[in-house]
Regions:
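Secretory targeting and sorting signals
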Residues: 1-33
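Trp/Gly-enriched beta-strand/coil motifs that build multi-repeat beta-propeller-like domains
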Residues: 36-406
Length: 406
């Protein structure tokens, strides 16, 4: 499918997300010999519409195509990567890009328009059109928040997981850094909120889907992560939601909250400051399975204690649970409705630089905004410091075709 960079704001995320990639262009079946002639690990093309005649093949990027320029008509992607067919030389993207999905078996074929001038191979679909990671900008806070900042520069950071299982560190200046080369799709929960290991650096906690183990990845203070350490031996798949919270127990150490699937109970796991968790304490007797998002957002109401933001699935309402010593105070309505249109919630501290904790969200397909709509709009809701939020600000539209934000 031809995808134009000029379409994004309203439709590009949706269009790309629905592309079947490499299964398009039905027509007369090409000669089987032509398909089987394409070696494993190669992308192949023919000048004919039925895959016969002289074959072009490559397993590396081609900035120019020589005599094959603007001649591809039928193609096979016999690789495990996405293949980007660019209308211009040198992988330029202003005109259009045809995207062909991985087909390691090499049995699928299709048609492309005879306008291809360069070919590139990438691990994820979005990299045919955009960088592997989205844009992220944050203002410099007046003081360190103690969380949401992996490199201690007082700019809120984001971790992004892509569909290839890589982990990217976004430092708040629009740039990105690869901090996890592979394997992160094996984690079905990733959370962070401050220092759990006692070295004054923010850490990352991950739950391993296959084992239910909880792992601590110590922050290096630069955005990268150290060697993981076992934090919970097993059983964590029994929890429907896990949130790194900050200090709820009142001992100055970061804690973890978890909702038990079978009971809907909310448990507090106090941090020890040494990378482990203490004996759990019940802080919510029931009903927490009714919440479809939990965010340790820092001090939202200005009382000096960390608070919890929760989304109620049945109503789309957003609730603030004020932190007390080892418990929560009475909840306060923070957002009346519509919050089910958000895919992800991020509590990163002060994003806008006004000294108040803010809330960041990433939208679902149902979102309709002023300048952005659909999947992958990134919004900032500035905190007022009294438990309320100001109107949203649409700050980016390229947070789509990824696999999680933390």
């Amino acid at each position: 499918m031809r995808v134009s960079l000029l379409r994004r704001v309203a439709t590009m995320a949706t269009t790309l997300g629905l592309t079947s990639l490499g299964l398009l262009g039905a027509g007369a079946a090409p000669a089987q010999a032509a398909i089987s002639d394409c070696p494993a690990g190669y992308f192949c093309a023919w000048k004919s519409e039925n895959g016969t005649g002289t074959m072009f093949k490559t397993n590396t990027n081609k900035a120019t195509l020589g005599t094959w320029n603007n001649t591809f008509q039928s193609v096979v992607n016999h690789t495990s990567k996405f293949v980007c067919l660019h209308d211009d030389t040198n992988y330029s993207k202003p005109d259009g890009v045809d995207i062909w999905g991985p087909d390691p078996a090499g049995t699928e074929w299709g048609h492309t328009e005879p306008t291809v001038s360069s070919v590139s191979f990438v691990p994820t679909e979005r990299e045919c059109i955009l960088p592997a990671y989205p844009q992220w900008y944050a203002s410099t806070a007046s003081q360190a928040a103690g969380f949401g900042d992996l490199n201690a520069d007082r700019q809120a950071d984001v971790l992004v997981r892509d569909k290839a299982g890589r982990l990217w560190f976004l430092r708040g200046d629009g740039s990105g850094q690869l901090v996890g080369k592979s394997g992160w799709n094996g984690m079905n929960a990733l959370v962070r909120h401050g220092d759990f290991s006692g070295d004054a650096r923010e850490d990352v906690i991950a739950r391993e889907a296959s084992t239910g183990k909880l792992w601590l990845y110590p922050g290096a203070g630069t955005g990268s992560l150290g060697s993981r350490k076992l934090m919970g031996n097993g059983g964590w798949n029994a929890m429907s939601r896990i949130a790194a919270y900050g200090d709820l127990s009142g001992d100055g150490r970061s804690d973890v909250l978890a909702v038990e699937k079978s009971t809907g109970k909310l448990w507090l796991y106090p941090g020890t400051g040494t990378g482990t968790l203490g004996a759990r304490k019940l802080i919510g007797a029931s009903g927490w399975n009714g919440m479809s998002a939990l965010v340790g957002a820092g001090d939202m109401n200005g009382d000096g204690r960390a608070d919890l933001i929760a989304r109620q699935a049945s109503t789309g309402q957003l609730w603030l649970y004020p932190g007390k010593a080892g418990a929560f105070g009475s909840r306060v309505l923070m957002g009346n409705s519509g919050w089910n249109g958000m895919d992800s919630f991020l509590g990163l501290g002060d994003v806008t630089g006004d000294g108040r904790a803010d809330l960041v969200t990433i939208t679902k397909s149902s979102y309709v905004g002023e300048a952005c709509r659909g999947v992958g709009c990134q919004l900032v809701y500035p905190g007022r410091g009294n438990g309320a939020l100001d109107s949203r600000v649409e700050t980016a539209g390229d947070w789509w075709n990824l696999n999680g934000f933390f």
